[in-house]
Structures are given as C-alpha cells and as structure tokens.
From Swiss-Prot:
InterPro entries, per the entry: 6-Pfructokinase_euk, ATP_PFK, PFK_vert-type, Phosphofructokinase_CS, Phosphofructokinase_dom, PKF_sf
Subunit structure: Homo- and heterotetramers. Phosphofructokinase (PFK) enzyme functions as a tetramer composed of different combinations of 3 types of subunits, called PFKM (M), PFKL (L) and PFKP (P). The composition of the PFK tetramer differs according to the tissue type it is present in. The kinetic and regulatory properties of the tetrameric enzyme are dependent on the subunit composition, hence can vary across tissues. Interacts (via C-terminus) with HK1 (via N-terminal spermatogenic cell-specific region).
HAMAP family: Phosphofructokinase_I_E
Keyword Protease: no
Protein name listed in UniProt: ATP-dependent 6-phosphofructokinase, muscle type
Originating gene: PFKM
Biological classification of the source: Eukaryota, Metazoa, Chordata, Craniata, Vertebrata
C-alpha cells in the first residue's frame, strides 16, 4: 500500500498535460479544469491551458500557456469555461491536426485532457490514432527533430464529458446537466405562479436536439402534464390524448397545465413537433389561454450546482490519474460516473453507442434507442409514464390501505416523496392515508385519507407539509396499535431521517408484543445530514449542499474584496461530516473539520500555518468548514479564537453559523427526482409485500424482510431489512459505520494544496460498456 501512496506524488514528474474545453460550454467545466491543473501539479507534471478549444491547439502561440496553482483560483463557482471554447473547422482537416501535433511536440506535451461533447471526444480519438503518422510527416518536413519525435512517440488521451444534454452513453450524468436542470426548474417554478394566477397552459421548450433527458427529468421534477422527447414519440392519436389529459387535470381542480417539449421532439413518422404546433392545438381544441416559453441559452448559463462542481472535480482527478497511468496500449478512455462510482470506459465504445442511439432514432427503432440510453433514463421514463398517463381505477375493490408519514427534521424533497407514494398507491388501486406529525400523529390519530389532488403541486415545495416530529414510537405502541386497527392500516411508508430508521427498528421489536405492528413498512431516507444507514444518499442532502455552497460563494466574494480574511463556517449534519466535506469540495474550502476524521490541535496548527503561507500568494482569503459536532472541545468559537490569535497581523478571521437555512428552500432537481423515484419504488415494493403477507383476510408480516430501508447503494436502489443494518450503525453518534464519501476527503486536501499521500488503489479501472449494460440493477 505504501508503495502506491507515494507513487501518486511522483507519477507526473517529467510529463506534461494539456487541458482544453471544446464544443458547447457547460457549467462545471471550470471545476474540472481546476482539478486537472492542481492534481497535475501535485503529481509533479507540468500543466498547460489550451485556450479556445481545438482552435487554440491548431493556432498554438499564446493559446497554449502553462498553468499555475493560483491561475485556477476563484474558478470553481464560475459558469461556462474560463479558458474558452470554439467550434473548430481546421481540426477536422488533417492539415489542422498536423499543426496541432507540431504545437504539442514543441512543448513536450504527450497527454491531452479533452472536456467536451461526443464530437470533441471523437476528434481527440482520431488525433490519437493518427499521431505516429503525423509525427513522421513533421519529421520528414524538418519541423521536428528525430529526438523530439522519439520523446513524444505516443499521445495519451482522456475525455471528460461536458454537455448539458446528458446525451453521452456510458455515463449517468455529464458535467453541466445538473446545473442546466437547476436553471430550468427555477424558470418552471417562476412560471407556475403566474400560470396559476391566470389559469394558463404553458408550453416550455428545453434544449436537447437528439436527447430528451432534460425534458424528461424536468417533467418529473415539476409534475408536468405531458412531455415530448425525441426517443419516445407519442402515439398517432396523441392530439386527442393530450387534450383529454389537459381537460381532466383542469376538471380535478388544477389551475394550470405544463407541457415540456425537447427541441428535437418528433412524431412516429419523424416529423418535428414544435411548441407552436402544440400551442395552436390547445387553443383550437380547448380554447385555453396558452403561452409558449423557449428557454434557449439560459440553460447553459449561471453558476454550476454543487453536484456539477463535485462531479467536475472528481472527474478531473480521475482524468489525471488515467493519463499518467496510460501506456501506448491503453485505449483512449472517458472518465464517467455510474451511480456514485467513478469509472473509466473506452472512449470509442461510448461514442459508438451514442451514435447507435441517433441511428436507431433515425431508423425509427425507438424502443432500442430508449434501451441504449441506459437504465437511469429508462427508469425516469417508466415513472413519468405511471404518474402522468395512468388513470386511477374507479373502484377500490380488493384494495389495501397504506399510510404515509414524515419523521425527523424537515428536508427538502419530503413532499415530492409523499406525492409520488400517494399517487402510485392510488394508481395501484389502494386507499392512501397521510399521517400528520410523525409517530406522534399516528398515536393521536391525526390521520386522513388522501385523494389524487390532495398532493397536487407538492413536488416543488420545501419542508414537510404533513408535519414532522422526532418522537419515536416505543412509548405509544398501545395507541399506535389501536389506530392501525381503527384505520385498517396494512402498510406504512416512513419518509425521514435517522429517527425514521430507529423508529423502524422499534416497530420491529414491538411486533413481539403487538400483532397489529406486523405490517410491512419501508423507510425512505430523507434528511439533510445524509446519515441514514443503508443509503449513500438521502433526500434533502443535495438541496442543503447547494444552500451551503451558495452561501460560501458569497462569503468568499466578500473575503476576496477585503483581502487577508479567513472565514470559519459551521454546517449542520449532527455527527455526520457529509455536508461539510462535500460543501468543502464544492466551494473550494481550505479545510473541513468532521467527526469521522479525528483531528488534534496539531492539525489545527498545520492549517493555520498553511493559511499563513497562502496569504503570501495572490490568493488572499481562506474558507474553513466545520461540522457542528466534529469535536466537543474544538468548537467553532475555539477554532475562531485560535485562528484570530495565530493569524494576528497576517489575516483576520470571521465566523458564520449557517443554522436552519440548510433545512429550507425549494428542493433541487436532484432531490425532486430522487424523491419521486424513491416513492414510486417504495410503493411498488409495498404492494408486493402486502399481497405476500395477506392470509385469511388479514395482513400478517413478521419476517425481517417486511421492514426495510430503501437506499441508493453504489449503482442500484436496494431494499435492506432494518434489522440487518443494525450491525452497520453507530447508534451513539447516529451515523453508519462505513461511509463512501470519506474517500473523497484526500481530493479536498490536495485541491487545497496539502502535501498528502493519495491512495491510488481506489481509482477506477477500465470497464466495458456492453458488459456494464447487462449486469446492472434497475435504479
């Protein structure tokens, strides 16, 4: 292991890396550029910026400049790409590529990191395959010497996919997609208020010429009435169907209709469906007041979301490792994301599958196009179809009664989870009840039936509309059992944080005494702290992360103006350091103190010395995050006092406790979508479990697998019995014993210029896309 530790620090000595951004810009590209530069320098390599994409590579000169550590400071929170991007005709010609090769060889650069879409990455692969021919041409014409040719005998290429459309196969999320969704959802939320005031129908056109991802996720995240995407053209009688759907929604009491259209939407015959066509149809047939909004380039703009900054940073680190470990025999690869795992995939395999999708759509093999888009896309489509197109049955014969509740502290996205649970339950023909104020409400009988429109418009609302309490059930088993019988509750969906999980464990224990508690239940993790065992992510954490990030950006801006100032910021999370660590990565913090990574006074001293050194450079500001319970003695005040004293005359310190604003705000697209899918998945499981446990006219479920936590684990959504998770829990500190994100902490330290050892054994290995497709669970 130690051999691997030290290998990373010397991996790049004598090597040079060039980084360029090409094609359409995407938010988060700067985070990737910053990570490539800093990790490159950390490994001992020289790193060069190529300005203006491939055009800069062809033109050379001042377009290729060496980067320094400080030259990527304050880049993280900027949208677009700071080093510029351009569509380049010259590079498509061999002559242009010859000039590009000449520019690289002269600078001794043999590693190229390309951040762009599939066109940019295909170009890079062509460049690599021609490399030796280009060198021999340059040598023949006397532009380079034999020695230079030998030194640069092969070119390593790694691609990072930067595209807001998420149209690249083999990666769950491309850099920029999440931020584009943020822009779209901000606009949808704004339009919703005006549409409701006037009872209007809005047709929103979003980007995506060949890929409907943005349109699909937007419609899931805002509960749209209809979505048009290129991969799944509507049936021939769609006009009838659409108008019927819109009038049904109105008749149920809704004051607005939202229709989302991807710019590349087509019908079954390949004829484009435009926003204007839809508007005219609705006006002509239904006479509704209908408006069209084309979002356009707004979607590419603005600040990158926390997700994109972390994604860009992680991918940048992985790209440097892939380049420096590359040999003439390793294929050009793409670094991508699967679940929350970084993976390396052969570049041309991904490009090929991406082209196959386009071909399948051109040849109208739409089912195949949908399959090739991958499991995440398919899932979104299935859930959308269920929620938007299936009508609840009229009769409730043979139906079961399922109750939904919130437990713990409020988290953004809880309402979205309640909405999808209730609606999927109704679609399956069940009677759905909602419980107010958690287990306390269950004991007091604060329970009512929820119909379809009860949860209308809940997706985008923050907090908990049902009301939530931290009270655990044990003390009130008597009353809870009585109410389970009284309301004939046959299944329980518990949406909440650590208390929801411990409450689940108590219900399991209580089954021995109370038969009434022998009903299936499922816990959907929803807490800003992300500390529920059995899940890598919980609903609400992404929203909190973005809130912290936005605040840190503003604070950094203030510090940059004041100069020589260090801010100490306290985040929430109980004992769980997820928010502090991830926000540290996303906001470019100098340090993040957390409970899981114990620190001593010596560590605090090292950090102060580090900041003293930093103040000597051009970057005269510091940002330090501290999780609220990271250490009972080294409090925020203690750290602030220590920094103030030690920094006297060099920097001054300020502290900020962010507090409960981290629980509020409207949910981010990630949390809305994640909560909606979790609710649907939980309800499908519940229906199956109730049928399994139904004997002699009543429900009796006492097996361990009838009480589960539904969690996201690496690449799949899985149900795990609460009793099995007991072993994996540190109950005193309310955290799981093992947490995946701890391995991202070294990245935070390296990007903040600490000389630490990076364990490269955890890095991604090359996988193959075809094998990847078949062996995966459906999230």
């Amino acid at each position: 292991m130690t051999h691997e530790h030290h290998a990373a620090k010397t991996l790049g000595i004598g090597k040079a890396i060039a980084v360029l951004t090409s094609g359409g810009d995407a938010q988060g590209m700067n985070a990737a550029v910053r990570a490539v530069v800093r990790v490159g320098i950390y490994t001992g390599a020289r790193v060069f910026f190529v300005h203006e994409g491939y055009q800069g590579l062809v033109d050379g000169g001042d377009n290729i400049r060496e980067a320094t550590w400080e030259s990527v400071s304050m880049m993280l929170q900027l949208g677009g790409t700071v080093i510029g991007s351009a569509r380049c005709k010259d590079f498509r010609e061999r002559e242009g590529r010859l000039r590009a090769a000449h520019n690289l060889v002269k600078r001794g650069i043999t590693n190229l990191c390309v951040i762009g879409g599939d066109g940019s990455l295909t170009g890079a692969d062509t460049f690599r395959s021609e490399w030796s021919d280009l060198l021999s041409d340059l040598q023949k014409s006397g532009k380079i010497t034999a020695e230079e040719a030998t030194k640069s005998s092969y070119l390593n290429i790694v691609g990072l996919v930067g595209s807001i459309d998420n149209d690249f196969c083999g990666t769950d999320m491309t850099i920029g997609t999440d931020s584009a969704l943020h822009r779209i959802i901000e606009i949808v939320d704004a339009i919703t208020t005006t549409a409701q005031s006037h009872q209007r129908t809005f047709v929103l056109e979003v980007m995506g010429r060949h890929c409907g991802y943005l349109a699909l996720v937007t419609s899931l995240s805002c509960g749209a009435d209809w979505v048009f995407i290129p991969e799944c053209p509507p049936d021939d009688d769609w006009e009838e169907h659409l108008c019927r759907r819109l009038s049904e929604t109105r008749n149920r009491g809704s004051r607005l209709n939202i229709i989302i259209v991807a710019e590349g939407a087509i019908d079954k015959n390949g004829k484009p469906i435009t926003s204007e066509d839809i508007k005219n149809l609705v006006v002509k047939r239904l006479g509704y007041d209908t408006r069209v909004t084309v979002l356009g380039h707004v979607q590419r703009g603005g600040t990158p979301s926390a997700f994109d900054r972390i994604l860009g940073s992680r991918m940048g680190v992985e790209a440097v490792m892939a380049l420096l470990e590359g040999t003439p025999d390793t294929p050009a690869c793409v670094v991508s994301l699967s679940g929350n795992q970084a993976v390396r995939l052969p570049l041309m395999e991904c490009v090929q599958v991406t082209k196959d999708v386009t071909r399948a759509m051109d040849e109208r093999r739409f089912d195949e196009a949908l399959k090739l888009r991958g499991r995440s896309f398919m899932n979104n489509w299935e859930v959308y179809k269920l929620l938007a197109h299936v009508r609840p049955p009229k009769s409730k014969s043979g139906s079961h009664t399922v109750a939904v509740m919130n437990v713990g502290a409020p988290a953004a996205g809880m309402n979205a989870a309640v909405r999808s649970t209730v609606r999927i339950g109704l679609i399956q023909g069940n009677r759905m009840l909602v419980v107010h104020d958690g287990f306390e409400g269950l004991a007091k009988g604060q329970i009512e039936e929820a119909g379809w429109s009860y949860v209308g418009g809940w997706t985008g609302q923050g907090g908990s509309k049902l009301g939530t309490k931290r009270t655990l059930p044990k003390k009130s088993f008597e009353q809870i059992s009585a109410n389970i019988t009284k309301f004939n509750i046959q299944g329980l969906v518990i949406i909440g944080g650590f208390e929801a999980y411990t409450g689940g464990l108590e219900l399991m224990e209580g089954r021995k005494q109370y038969d009434e508690l022998c009903i299936p239940f499922v816990v959907i993790p929803a807490t800003v702290s992300n500390n529920v065992p059995g899940s890598d992510f919980s609903v609400g954490a992404d929203t909190a992360l973005n809130t912290i990030c936005m605040t840190c950006d503003r604070i950094k801006q203030s510090a940059a103006g004041t100069k020589r100032r260090v801010f100490i910021i306290e985040t929430m999370g109980g004992y769980c350091g997820y928010l502090a660590t991830m926000a540290g990565l996303a906001a470019g913090a100098d340090a993040a103190y957390i409970f899981e990574d114990p620190f001593t006074i010596r560590d605090l001293q090292v950090n102060v010395e580090h900041l003293v050194q930093k103040m000597k450079t051009t970057v005269k500001r510091g940002l330090v995050l501290r999780n609220e319970k990271c250490n009972e003695n080294y409090t925020t005040d203690f750290i602030f006092n220590l920094y103030s004293e030690e920094g006297k005359g060099i920097f001054d310190s300020r502290k900020n406790v962010l507090g409960h604003m981290q629980q509020g705000g409207s949910p981010t697209p990630f949390d809305r979508n994640f909560a909606t899918k979790m609710g649907a998945k939980a309800m499908n499981w519940m229906s199956g479990k109730i049928k399994e446990s139904y004997r002699n006219g009543r429900i009796f479920a006492n097996s361990p697998d009838s009480g589960c936590v539904l969690g996201m684990r690496k690449r799949a959504l899985v149900f795990q019995p609460v009793t099995e998770l007991k072993e994996q829990t540190d109950f005193e500190h309310r955290i799981p014993k093992e947490q995946w994100w701890l391995k991202l902490r070294p990245i935070l330290k390296i990007l903040a210029k600490y000389e630490i050892d990076l364990d490269t054994s955890e890095h991604a290995h090359l996988e193959h896309i075809s094998r990847k497709r078949s062996g995966e669970a459906n999230v």
